Amino acid sequence: DLSVYDWKGKDIGCLVENEGKEIRLFFEAEIPPFGYSTYCIKKKEAGKKEASESRFVLEGNKVNKQEYVVENDMYKIVFDLSKGGTIKSLIAKKEGNKDFAGKTEKYALGELRGFFYEEGKFRSSIETPAKLTVVRDNVYEQKIKIEGEIASHPFTQVITLTKGTRRIDFDLTVDWKNNVGIGEYKEERWRDNRRAYCDDRFKLSVLFPTDLHSPRVYKNAPFDVCESKLTDTFFGSWDQIKHNIILHWVEL
């Protein structure tokens, strides 16, 4: 067993998990805005009680065969496995328990969607049920793996919640069976102004519909941050370009 101490010699508590031949150590670090913090890892003294933060807590809660709940101190998220593992509810506890999952019937939060022009139609991950596996569930981190399909192509999505962090991490991998065509149509007229790859609505996308009134959008551009005044960013030809290039992030 291990213990973690801060620079004052205080035992701050930790959690150790075994991963095969390796171990993973979790602890909550405090770092100043400008500077660094030093921590010491020692073997736990014999007979010493564990700090309260070292307990396994917040185990994932199975709602029913179609839904699964993942929860930490920041969020409570309900995944709908019958619809490709999309997010049915996303409650932000620090924002007055507001549910940020869009209550629309058109799209789902976290849905994969694109126009497969060889089939002549849109395909979506909600067409196929998904499988959910709990990868990690402790006081510091909740991590799940969702396995589903879009148009028979399998995908894996790993979603991570970290204690005290507003960010939700998504890691998506699609295992393409072949070189499938996704877009408005197969481009053949390269001298035309209109191009098949311009309109984002037909591209492979991850959808994040939100239930916001009078939203404002800020975009991270090189050396600047811009507030968008556009109703949308859809265009079909290169001479009608709208600003849809993001450097790192979008704030909504």
Regions found by a protein language model. Give the residues of each.
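Acidic glycine/proline-rich low-complexity segments
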Residues: 94-119, 198-200, 209-232
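Generic ordered-secondary-structure signal
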Residues: 34-35, 43-45, 74, 141-143, ...
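Generic hydrophobic, helix-prone segments enriched in Leu/Val/Ile
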Residues: 14, 25, 87, 132, ...
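Trp/Gly-enriched beta-strand surface patches
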Residues: 1-22, 33, 214-252
